């Protein structure tokens, strides 16, 4: 999951919530020799206070995921982005499209294996159970990777900044 998330952050300059909010219907692979794969950013996944989610009366909330922590005051939600400008089409480099194709194949095999035990929300980045990742889980995976490989400490969001800098150079 971290490998896919890092590739999307760097290749497509996506925010963590945009990455976690991607569903497979947002991904469009090149067909018939066309070399243009792309994705549609139209949702974001974030963790919010349950009371705050209720207070919005469902405005812009597309889905509230079942809580995995008993007595938690927080919920993961899939919602529309804050602004209309955040909704956009992003072209996928071939290498990133290939990574996503391989990831999708593995995910479909897992869905086949687990059957009804897989909670299928059609998320691109889903845990082995089908449940969504939250940003804290991705941050933790990144920190573990950084420390295991003795790399400089960076934030996940810095991948987005590096991506933009690289594209401007």
What are these regions (language model features)?
Residues 1-16, 20-22, 32-36, 49, ...:
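Basic, Lys/Arg- and aromatic-enriched nucleic-acid-binding interface segment
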Residues 1-2, 12, 90, 105-169:
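Short, basic (Lys/Arg/His-rich) helix/loop patches that form interaction surfaces
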Residues 7, 101, 166:
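A cross-family signal for key residues in well-ordered alpha-helices
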Residues 10-12, 45, 96, 129:
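Short, flexible loop/turn elements at secondary-structure junctions
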Residues 15, 96, 160:
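A generic "binding-loop/recognition-motif" signal
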Residues 15, 48-49, 99, 133, ...:
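Flexible loop/turn segments at secondary-structure boundaries
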Residues 22-109:
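Conserved tyrosine-mediated DNA breakage-rejoining catalytic core shared by Y-recombinases
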